[in-house]
Amino acid sequence: MALRFPRFSQGLAQDPTTRRIWFGIATAHDFESHDDITEERLYQNIFASHFGQLAIIFLWTSGNLFHVAWQGNFETWIQDPLHVRPIAHAIWDPHFGQPAVEAFTRGGALGPVNIAYSGVYQWWYTIGLRTNEDLYTGALFLLFLSALSLIGGWLHLQPKWKPRVSWFKNAESRLNHHLSGLFGVSSLAWTGHLVHVAIPASRGEYVRWNNFLNVLPHPQGLGPLFTGQWNLYAQNPDSSSHLFGTSQGSGTAILTLLGGFHPQTQSLWLTDMAHHHLAIAILFLIAGHMYRTNFGIGHSIKDLLEAHIPPGGRLGRGHKGLYDTINNSIHFQLGLALASLGVITSLVAQHMYSLPAYAFIAQDFTTQAALYTHHQYIAGFIMTGAFAHGAIFFIRDYNPEQNEDNVLARMLDHKEAIISHLSWASLFLGFHTLGLYVHNDVMLAFGTPEKQILIEPIFAQWIQSAHGKTSYGFDVLLSSTNGPAFNAGRSIWLPGWLNAINENSNSLFLTIGPGDFLVHHAIALGLHTTTLILVKGALDARGSKLMPDKKDFGYSFPCDGPGRGGTCDISAWDAFYLAVFWMLNTIGWVTFYWHWKHITLWQGNVSQFNESSTYLMGWLRDYLWLNSSQLINGYNPFGMNSLSVWAWMFLFGHLVWATGFMFLISWRGYWQELIETLAWAHERTPLANLIRWKDKPVALSIVQARLVGLAHFSVGYIFTYAAFLIASTSGKFG
C-alpha cells in the first residue's frame, strides 16, 4: 500500500474514515506525538521551521515595499503627508461597473486602488526613505534575506549541519546570543541608521551608499566620543519651527533628551529615539555578557536559581529544580516566550498611539485606530497561547519529584486559594460594574439622568496629576508649578514632556471621568475572568478533586464516557477554548472604548463620550449604531461609494461569525446523521455517484468541532469589527 497522509503517524494513516484527514491536520505540528520522534529530531525540526517562518516574514515585508513602489504614491505622499491618501496597491479587476471604478480611484491614482491604513508610509518616511527606488532596493534586499533564510533552514537539516541537543540546551550561550547579538547589536545598528540616514533625511540631507562616508552625521565627528564630551552631541537640537524633511529650523544634535513631540509631525523627536536605541544597545550588550559561556567567568543560570531560596522558608525550596524543569521543557519555554511577547504586543498598541514614533502618523486617524486594534487582538491570541502551552507543560513535562516543595510545586499546592481569589475578584467586578451601568440605564429610561451614579476616578486623576497633568487642579508633584521636580523638568530633563502632557492635540494622559471609570472596571472584569479561566485550566490540567487522573487523558479530551458523570468540558483545552471567547469579548470592550473616546476627541465633541458612556444604551446607540450608519449605507439604489467594500466585509464577517454557532451548538450525532443521509443520497444520484471516496465520511470529533466553531467565531468577530472600525473612521476623516 502506498504511503498515505499522514506519514508521521502510521496508526492514523490506516484509519478507514475521514478522521484520518482531520486528525492528520490537527497533529501535523505536534512533533512530539509523531512516530519515531527523538528529542534530537524534535529540536531540529523546530529550529528548521524557525528559518521558514523568517523566510515568510521577509517575503511578506518585501511584498509590501514592492507593491507600494510599483503601484503606490509614496513620492507624491511625501510632498503633502497630511492631505494625500497613501496607496497600498492597485485593484486589478474592479467588479460592479463604472461606479466602482470611480469610487475606488483616489489618492491621485489613475485607476482603482486600496488605501494603506498600516502606517508603512509614515514609517518609511521617518526612517529616511524618499524615493520609489529606495523602496525597490529594500524589497530586493528582503527578498535576498528570505532566500537566505530558506537556505539556512535546509542547511540545518543536513546531517553535517544539524545542531545537537546539547547546543539547544546551552542556556548561557543562548542568552549571550539573544541579548547581545539580537537585541544589543540590532539596537546599535538601528541607532547607526537613525544617526547616519534618518536624522540627516529629516534635515533635508539625502545620505546613501555613494556619499555615506563623506557626510558627517555631526559637525564634530567622533571627537566628542573619544574626549568624553558627550554632551556636545545633544547641543543645538532641531527647533520647534523645524519643517520635517527640510533644513529649515533644523539643528545639528544627534542624541538628545528633549521629551515631547516635534510640533509639526506630532511624533517623538528622532534625536530622542536615536538616544533611546543607543541606551538600549549598551544595556543589552552588557546584559548578554553576564553569563558563563566558554570562558568560565560570569553567572551560571543553574547556580543562580539553586541559590534563590527565600529566607524564612515561606516559599519552601525556592527555585531549586527549576533550571532543569524549564530547560528540558519546550512547552514551558514557549509559554514564557508567548507571555512576554503578548505583553510587549499590548504595550506596542498602547504606546503607538500615546507616543507616536512616526512622522504625521498621529494625524492619520484611521491608521491609528487600525494599529491599536490590530496589536491588541494579536496580544490577546498570544497571551492565551502562553497559558495553553503552560497547561501542556503540566501534562507532558512536569515532574513532581524534580520540583518537590519549590515555587512551582507550591503554586499547584495552593491552587484552590489562587482560583477562588480570582473568582471572587471577577464576581465582585462583574456585579458591581453591571449594577452601575444598569442603574444608570434605568435612570435615563425614566427621564431622570441626574439620578445616575457617577463616580469620578480621583485616584487615577491624582496619578495623572503627579505625572504633570495640570487640568484637574491637584497641584501635586509634577503638576505643582513651584516644586523642584517641575523646575528641573523645564531645564535638566525632557523639557518638552510636561508641555506635551498638557497639550490637547495628542493622546497623552487623556482627561478621564465617570464613563472611563465604568468601562475601566468592565475591562478589569474581562481581564480577571479570562485570567481565571486560563489559570484554572493550567493549574487543574494534571488533575482535580473531581478527576484526579486527568493528566492521563492528555491535553484535549471531550469526556471520560458516561460512567463518570461530570467529566465533560474539564480538559485543559476546554479552558483555553472558553478563555478565547472571554479574551475576544474583553478586547472588544477595550477597542470600543479606545475608538469611541478618540473619535469624539478628533471630532472635538468629547462631551458625547462623557455623557453617553455612563450607561449601556449610550454605548449601543451613540457608539455602535451611530457609527455603523456608514456601513449600512455602503451601497444603495444610487450605486456604490468607497466604503462599499467595508460594508460587504461587515456583512461577510457577521456571516462567518454566525457560522461558528453551527459548530458550537450542535455536536457529533446530529452531523453524523446528516452526513449519512447525504452520503446515501449521493450514492443514489445519477452522475454524482460516479464520484467515489475511499474514506468513510464521519462527523468531526467534539473537540474538533469546537475548534472549527471557535475559529469561525474569532475570525468573523474580528472581520466584522475591522470593517466597522475602518469604515466609520475613514468615513469621518477621509
Swiss-Prot record:
It catalyses: reduced [plastocyanin] + hnu + oxidized [2Fe-2S]-[ferredoxin] = oxidized [plastocyanin] + reduced [2Fe-2S]-[ferredoxin]. GO terms for molecular function: 4 iron, 4 sulfur cluster binding; chlorophyll binding; electron transfer activity; magnesium ion binding; oxidoreductase activity. PsaA and PsaB bind P700, the primary electron donor of photosystem I (PSI), as well as the electron acceptors A0, A1 and FX. PSI is a plastocyanin-ferredoxin oxidoreductase, converting photonic excitation into a charge separation, which transfers an electron from the donor P700 chlorophyll pair to the spectroscopically characterized acceptors A0, A1, FX, FA and FB in turn. Oxidized P700 is reduced on the lumenal side of the thylakoid membrane by plastocyanin. It comes from Arabis hirsuta. One of its GO terms (cellular component) is chloroplast thylakoid membrane. The PsaA/B heterodimer binds the P700 chlorophyll special pair and subsequent electron acceptors. PSI consists of a core antenna complex that captures photons, and an electron transfer chain that converts photonic excitation into a charge separation. The eukaryotic PSI reaction center is composed of at least 11 subunits. This is Photosystem I P700 chlorophyll a apoprotein A2. The chain crosses the membrane at residues 46-69, 135-158, 175-199, 273-291, 330-353, 369-395, 417-439, 517-535, 575-596, 643-665, 707-727.
